[in-house]
Swiss-Prot record:
Residues 71-86 have a biased composition (Basic residues). Pfam families: Peptidase_M24 (PF00557). One of its GO terms (cellular component) is cytoplasm. It is found in: Cytoplasm. It is an enzyme of class 3 (hydrolase). Its cofactor is Co(2+); Zn(2+); Mn(2+); Fe(2+). A divalent metal cation 1 binds at D218, D229, E428. Substrate binds at H198, H308. Keywords: Aminopeptidase, Cytoplasm, Hydrolase, Metal-binding, Protease. GO terms for biological process: proteolysis. The keyword Protease applies. This is Methionine aminopeptidase 2. It comes from Candida albicans (strain WO-1) (Yeast).
Length: 447
């Protein structure tokens, strides 16, 4: 999830939940298009894995004759195999040990050699195993969900259909109805073309994915508040129009990952990213467009139940001498654009999150107080969107929601856009800074 200008065990996680006064949650069930924001949009629950995609084929049994001489044909009976329902990935990993991400050495050789040989550091890292397993479980869910998305999303689908496909898959793989235990880490980003981030459809949105669109797919998965944040860009144009910007952004992201590490200054990471990104140009209709870093979008560190936790990882040289530290978690993401390289808020808002440390703020009305309790019970400080509120049964909530925003209790995150007619792309991974090495926990075969 775009950012703009830990060794805890289960008891600590539960205490964080209790601090929010959380009871059992209620049943869980822009571009230019706008929705009404108050309807109920339910997603299908029959998602299946890619390997099950052929299970819908109709099987026709052959007709047989009923007597010698007469050839009476029986009506063919078409039988459909039932789709295989996605089940929690816990069934695949009964011991609770999930696949590790990609391990990488730290860039600073003197620090790296010390940490690799330090038994004490490695011992301390093992003591945080529950934390790492939460991240690895979330990452494995993320890989399976995006595999489903990449094999299923096609032009002609509505944004609602795409969002439901992804989000229902996250819910099913997580296998937990308590949204604060495991599930969606933040609203699914499906930003098109000049829209760089923070677009997800509201109920009633009729926007349809077109063949010439370039779509950023930003998916968040959390387990016990440990959030995996990873994004990729999809295109369907067959003439290779977007190949250059895709390559620029992907390479810039991998450069940021390579340069990240304990004691590395944030400015140095941004400078390395910028050098790679801005070495590319994109051609369209005989014109050449330089690929620019979107300078007011950043990567960010992640804390439990908090997607943007204070430190920002720039994608340009910005003079920030703050260092990354051992044990921190970062989302390394880069955005490239053929436009101004600067984004502004525009369009109907869908993304929201309750701010931290707002316990002393009093909701201005009884309705906003009741809505705030729904938010606490179901999301805590995790980001959410209007559709998620509606799954809890909330209706006619917009006035109360806007009250919470005006009083600083809830933060709104509207879509952010570059100039119209430009194209933007994004790639992102979550990295864990272990004492001896870094782990690109969300890395997969796809990106």
């Amino acid at each position: 999830m775009a950012g703009a200008t830990e060794g805890e065990d289960t008891k600590v996680i539960e205490s964080k939940i209790n601090e929010l006064n959380i009871d059992k949650p209620k049943l869980e069930d822009n571009n230019e298009a706008k929705g009404n924001g108050n309807g109920n949009e339910s997603g299908g629950d029959d998602d299946d894995d890619k390997e099950d995609d052929d299970d819908n084929d109709e099987i026709t049994e052959p007709s047989t004759s009923t007597s010698s001489g007469d050839k009476k044909k029986k009506k063919n009976k078409n039988k459909k195999k039932k789709k295989k329902k996605i089940v929690s990935i816990d069934s695949s990993y009964p011991e609770g040990i999930f696949p590790e991400g990609q391990w990488m050495e730290y860039p600073l050789e003197d620090i790296n050699s010390y940490r690799t040989t330090s038994e004490e550091k490695r011992y301390l890292d093992r003591q945080q195993n529950n934390k790492w397993q939460d991240f690895r479980k979330g990452a494995e869910i993320h890989r399976r969900v995006r595999h489903k998305a990449q094999s299923s999303i096609r032009p002609g689908m509505t944004m609602i259909e795409i969002a439901n496909l992804i989000e229902d898959s996250v819910r099913n793989y997580s296998g937990n109805d308590h949204t604060l235990k495991a599930g969606i880490g933040f609203p699914t980003g499906l930003s098109l073309n000049h829209v760089a981030a923070h677009y997800t459809p509201n109920t009633g949105d009729k926007l349809i994915l077109k063949k010439d669109d370039i779509m950023k797919v930003d998916i968040g998965v959390h387990v016990n508040g440990r959030i995996c944040d990873s994004a990729f860009t999809m295109t369907f144009n067959e003439d290779g129009k977007y190949d250059t910007i895709m390559q620029a952004v992907k390479e810039a992201t991998y450069t940021g990952i390579k340069e990240s590490g304990i004691d590395v200054r944030l400015n140095d990471i941004g400078a390395a990213i910028q050098e790679v990104m801005e070495s590319y140009e994109m051609e369209e209709n005989g014109k050449t467009y330089p690929i620019k870093c979107i300078k007011n979008l950043n990567g960010h560190n992640i804390d439990d139940f908090v997607i943007h936790s204070g430190k920002s990882v720039p994608i340009i040289a910005n003079g920030d001498m703050t260092k990354m530290e051992e044990g921190e978690t970062f989302a390394i993401e880069t955005f490239g654009s053929t436009g101004n390289g600067y984004v502004l808020p525009e369009g109907e808002c869908s993304h929201y999150a309750m701010n931290k440390g707002v316990e002393h703020l009093k909701p201005p009305s009884e309705r906003s107080k009741q809505l705030l309790e729904t938010i606490k019970q179901n999301f805590g400080t995790l980001p959410w969107c209007r559709r998620y509120l509606e799954r809890t049964g909330e209706e006619k909530y917009l006035f109360a929601l806007n009250q919470l925003v005006r009083h600083g209790i809830v933060e709104e995150y509207p879509p952010i856009v570059d100039k119209r007619g430009s194209y933007t792309a994004q790639f992102e991974h979550t990295i864990l800074l272990h004492p001896h090495k870094k782990e690109v926990v969300t890395k997969g075969d796809d990106y």
